[in-house]
Design a protein with these regions (language model features):
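A short beta-strand-loop structural module common to alpha/beta enzyme folds
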Residues: 37-51, 171-174
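N-terminal beta1-alpha1 ligand-phosphate binding loop
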Residues: 2-38, 202
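Short, flexible coil/linker segments at domain boundaries that flank nucleotide/cofactor-interacting
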Residues: 1-2, 118
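Short loop/turn segments at strand-loop or loop-helix junctions that form parts
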Residues: 8-12, 127-131, 171-174
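A structural motif corresponding to the C-terminal end of an alpha-helix
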Residues: 33-40, 115, 121, 159-168
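Glycine-rich phosphate/pyrophosphate-binding loop and the adjoining helix
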Residues: 2, 23, 142-217
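Helix-loop-strand module that forms the ligand-binding subsite of alpha/beta enzymes
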Residues: 52-156
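Residues at alpha-helix caps and immediate loop-helix transition turns in enzyme cores, especially N-
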Residues: 19-23, 55, 77-81, 181, ...
């Protein structure tokens, strides 16, 4: 059996009134899911802990699949996760994450975003929101019927595409402050992990429709 190498990143920053507990729970669930499972090796990083940028680059290069767990603060990832990406990806310039922006001075108008060094790898992202899922889907509601992946996480997805990685279907947790149900969320997430990594349902999804199916959860 081919071994899949999984690198898990907890972006649930402890800051202000946020204790980061929800994403830490999801992060721990991911590690527990893969630990001891035949066919998987796992490494993990919590952005709240000290990290060595060179070692983090090695983790990206080592991994077949990167899993990000992040809350959304003010419609963006937390500043601690953004700093982690800035520091680690800068360290990874020409050392494993990206070589260049892909363009040449001879023809600078084309091929932007094709200089990544992580081709052949995949990533998955989960996000947690105070906003209910209806805020994204109902006419007249706040997000103008724009999904998480096509809206707030659009830049995050393009960031990973810049490195050469391809997406796996993710999962988004809504209304986690005023209407949380952690038992249901964990059951739904474990089912998602089984579907993606054990049953491999994603292999039957086309690249054109994976995000719509992922955000429907």
């Amino acid at each position: 059996m081919e071994t899949k190498k999984i690198f898990v990143i907890n972006g649930g920053q402890v800051f202000g009134h946020s204790g980061g507990r929800f994403n830490k729970t999801i992060f721990d669930t991911t590690r527990q899911f893969f630990n001891g499972k035949e066919g998987f090796e796992i490494r993990s990083t919590d952005i709240n802990d000290e990290y060595d940028p060179k070692h983090e680059v090695e983790n990206y290069v080592w991994a077949d699949i990167v899993i990000y767990h992040t809350p959304i603060w003010w419609f963006q990832v937390p500043n601690g996760l953004k700093k982690y990406i800035d520091v680690v990806f800068t360290e990874g310039h020409q050392t494993g994450i990206y070589h260049s922006d892909g363009r040449s001075s001879q023809n600078p108008t084309v091929n932007y975003g094709t200089g990544g060094m992580l081709h052949g790898k995949q990533y998955m992202v989960t996000s947690s929101w105070n906003a209910p899922k209806e805020a994204f889907s109902l006419p007249g509601e706040f997000f103008n019927e724009t999904s998480v992946d096509d809206g707030a996480l659009f830049g995050f997805h393009r960031m990973n595409a810049f490195t050469g990685m391809k997406p796996l279907p993710g999962l988004h947790f809504h209304d986690v402050e005023k209407n949380a149900n952690i038992v249901v969320d964990l059951e739904r997430y474990t089912t998602h992990l089984n579907n993606i990594f054990i049953n491999k349902e994603h292999e039957h999804l086309s690249n054109s429709n994976f995000q719509s199916q992922a955000t429907a959860h």
